[in-house]
């Protein structure tokens, strides 16, 4: 084992490395692992041999898909790193890792600056209020420009960067950094062997003025954050390195600003100072403080847990992974208390007991067994049967439910048909395991065709899931064409609609009458349905009310136009009637279901389609073709801007029009343009498109 798990939480950092696809995140993580002594053979993403990219496809595709948790040590501090993917189809991985991090390193490409995916990941980090430091990577690349990248952090992210280093040289002549906190040059001149220690030098004469200018900006920012420091600064006294670092740390932990460093991970330059900055400026579990949750069965009663060994045990499961030998691994962040292997805990989310088999701290896909799990750390557990992503584990005598995670619904679906009978059986196992691991992966049975339909966040996401079925579970299957996950909704209010369910066939019959109102609705937290009971005076017995709600929700699975799920509506149960003998839960469920269907037909039903936020980067000369093409795909151009010599077009385009776009774009621009897209929102489809969708769905 590397070193004992540190119990002094001041010396622990739980961080993520977040970036755009090719900003060099995996290489940066690799270097961190090398310099912290975990990894003795360096893996390059270019060769497909990186430590954190441990699934076969990640090695092939050179992109990080699964956030592996890695533990390492630096100057007597423990760093637990969650590697996050930089591809938009894997937003679920980013979301779930950000939920359990205390801080993050945002890696930017020194030539490209802030790219579309960086913006999205940055927004997700802001959602969970994760403090960040910025590492401007690839300073050795042709066209790398540190000052341009810092400006893009201001312009594109609306963030406040605090420059702590200036680059010495650029491109092939990038030799190191000027440290503005200690006012010294830290250099790695020429070609540097991995692990080489930097040389400390005087600041080069040609950078002296620039260093003085940026040092002054740094000191002003530091002085403004603290009255004592301001008095000292205006009295002309020197601020000590400790005072400067303390002030930067405080502002970083409060997300008031974001320290910026630079380097070239690939060329082994700038990694050690970045690790120092992780320790100096990013928060430890004690800085984050207590975590909030609610009592079991009562969301109004707020409970808290402090990051201490002496508190009752509480943890959040943030990832499930399949392991070739151990089966199901559950990654957890422990927020309070301690637990031993073999102990029984409560899954408060599901109300079930679980027994922990073994405990590990992970290093990519190697396991280090530990004999206790303590507050503030990240572990992998074996033996949990019912726990899934977002579940709370806690002490049985002190239950608490921690805030879970919200995951978007899939926007794209494909049908999948096993080739043989044995493939059919294996497919069942594969789907169950993959669905456990990935909350944005959905599975349903198309009742008309009998086909299994799987859904995900994009074409690449589904490609990789199908690929994993083949490799890991040996399932051979035919995969259909991608289909868009449409939705249906209503546009008008129906004040009153009544429905009576009556059946008389010898003996006791069935009777239920409901009167409902239906109206468009969107909840604050993104909820797409609300049920309100307005029945008074026992017109419908209390025990039958939930059946009406359940029936309505069943009916919402299949909309009234083309059979797509109904969303964004509120159902109010106004009145009704029952029969002492013939009424039952089942009768009211049927009545609720039929009433909703009939009312929805009167409520101006429409079809919704997913719109994607598309960003195309293209050379100037192809701009007209690109815009014309997006318009022909029903795209709405949102903005155009210039970025590092190229033009950028931002548009909202229906997902149904984006299949095969990459090939068309390449042929129109001779392979010189690229694009990214992320799900944006659902919007009503135009009438002519709606007709086509309905005709296709109903076979007319």
From Swiss-Prot:
Gene3D superfamilies: 3.30.230.10, 3.30.70.240, Elongation Factor G (Translational Gtpase), domain 3, P-loop containing nucleotide triphosphate hydrolases, Translation factors. It comes from the Bacteria. Transmembrane segments: none annotated. Residues 10-286 form the tr-type G domain. The keyword Transmembrane does not apply. This is Elongation factor G. GO terms for cellular component: cytoplasm. InterPro entries: EFG_II, EFG_III, EFG_III/V, EFG_IV, EFG_V, EFG_V-like, EFTu-like_2, G_TR_CS. It is found in: Cytoplasm. Belongs to the TRAFAC class translation factor GTPase superfamily. Classic translation factor GTPase family. EF-G/EF-2 subfamily. Catalyzes the GTP-dependent ribosomal translocation step during translation elongation. During this step, the ribosome changes from the pre-translocational (PRE) to the post-translocational (POST) state as the newly formed A-site-bound peptidyl-tRNA and P-site-bound deacylated tRNA move to the P and E sites, respectively. Catalyzes the coordinated movement of the two tRNA molecules, the mRNA and conformational changes in the ribosome.
């Amino acid at each position: 084992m590397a070193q004992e798990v540190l119990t002094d939480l001041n010396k622990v950092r739980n961080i993520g490395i977040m970036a755009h696809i090719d900003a060099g995140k995996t290489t940066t993580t690799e270097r961190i692992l090398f310099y912290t002594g975990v990894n003795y053979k360096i893996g390059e993403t270019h060769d497909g041999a990186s430590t954190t990219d441990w699934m076969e496809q990640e090695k092939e595709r050179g992109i990080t898909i699964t956030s592996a948790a890695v533990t390492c040590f630096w100057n007597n501090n423990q760093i637990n790193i969650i590697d996050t993917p930089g591809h938009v189809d894997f937003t679920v991985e980013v979301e779930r890792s950000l939920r359990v991090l205390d801080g993050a390193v945002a890696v930017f490409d020194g030539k490209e600056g802030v790219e579309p995916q960086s913006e999205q990941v940055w927004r997700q980090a802001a959602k969970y209020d994760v403090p960040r430091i910025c590492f401007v990577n690839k300073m050795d690349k042709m066209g790398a420009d540190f000052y341009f990248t810092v400006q893009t952090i201001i312009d594109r992210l609306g963030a406040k960067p605090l420059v702590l280093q200036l680059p010495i040289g650029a491109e092939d002549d990038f030799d190191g950094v000027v440290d503005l906190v200690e006012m010294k040059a830290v250099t790695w001149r020429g070609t540097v062997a991995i692990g080489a220690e930097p040389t400390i030098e005087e600041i080069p004469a040609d950078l002296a003025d620039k260093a003085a200018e940026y040092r002054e900006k740094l000191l002003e920012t530091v002085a403004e954050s603290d009255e004592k420091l301001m008095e000292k600064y205006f009295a002309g006294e020197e601020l000590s390195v400790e005072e400067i670092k303390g002030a930067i740390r405080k502002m970083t932990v409060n997300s008031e600003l974001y320290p910026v460093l630079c380097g070239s991970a690939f060329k082994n330059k700038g990694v050690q100072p970045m690790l120092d900055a992780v320790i100096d400026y990013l928060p430890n579990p004690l800085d984050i403080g207590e975590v909030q949750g609610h009592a079991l069965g009562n969301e109004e009663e707020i409970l808290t847990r402090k990051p201490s060994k002496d508190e009752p045990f509480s943890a959040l499961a943030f990832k499930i992974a399949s392991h070739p030998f151990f089966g199901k691994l559950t990654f957890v962040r422990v927020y309070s208390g301690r637990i031993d292997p073999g102990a029984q805990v409560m899954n408060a989310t599901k109300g079930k007991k679980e027994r922990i088999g073994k405990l590990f701290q992970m290093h990519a896909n190697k396991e280090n067994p530990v004999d206790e799990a303590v507050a503030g750390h990240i572990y992998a557990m074996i033996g949990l049967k019912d726990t899934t992503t977002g579940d709370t584990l806690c002490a049985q005598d002190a239950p608490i439910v921690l805030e879970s995670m919200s995951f978007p619904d899939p926007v794209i679906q494909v049908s999948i048909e096993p080739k043989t009978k044995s493939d059919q059986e294996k497919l069942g196992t594969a789907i169950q395991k993959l669905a456990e691991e990935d909350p944005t992966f959905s599975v349903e049975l198309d009742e008309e065709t009998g086909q299994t339909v799987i859904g995900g966040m994009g074409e690449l996401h589904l490609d990789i899931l199908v690929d994993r079925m083949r490799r890991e579970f040996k399932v051979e299957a035919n995969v259909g064409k991608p289909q868009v996950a449409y939705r249906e909704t209503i546009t008008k209010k129906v004040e009153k609609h009544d429905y009576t369910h009556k059946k008389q066939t010898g003996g006791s019959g069935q009777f239920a009458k409901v009167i409902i109102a239906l109206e468009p609705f969107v909840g604050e937290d993104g909820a797409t349905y609300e049920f309100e009971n307005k029945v008074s005076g026992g017109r419908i017995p209390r025990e039958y009310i939930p059946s009406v709600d359940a029936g309505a929700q069943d009916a919402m699975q299949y909309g009234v136009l083309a059979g797509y799920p109904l969303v964004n509506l509120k159902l109010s149960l106004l009145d009704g009637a029952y029969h002492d003998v013939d009424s039952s839960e089942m009768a009211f469920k049927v009545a609720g279901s039929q009433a909703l269907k009939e009312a929805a037909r009167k409520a101006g039903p429409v079809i919704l389609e997913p719109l994607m936020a598309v960003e195309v980067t293209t050379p100037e000369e192809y701009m007209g073709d690109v815009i014309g093409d997006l318009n022909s795909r029903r795209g709405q151009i949102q903005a155009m801007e210039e970025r590092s010599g190229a033009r950028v077009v931002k548009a909202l385009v229906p997902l149904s029009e984006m299949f095969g776009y990459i090939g068309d774009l390449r042929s129109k621009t001779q392979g010189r343009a690229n694009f990214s897209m992320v799900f944006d929102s659902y919007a009503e489809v135009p009438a002519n498109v709606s007709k086509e969708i309905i005709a296709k769905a109903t076979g007319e």
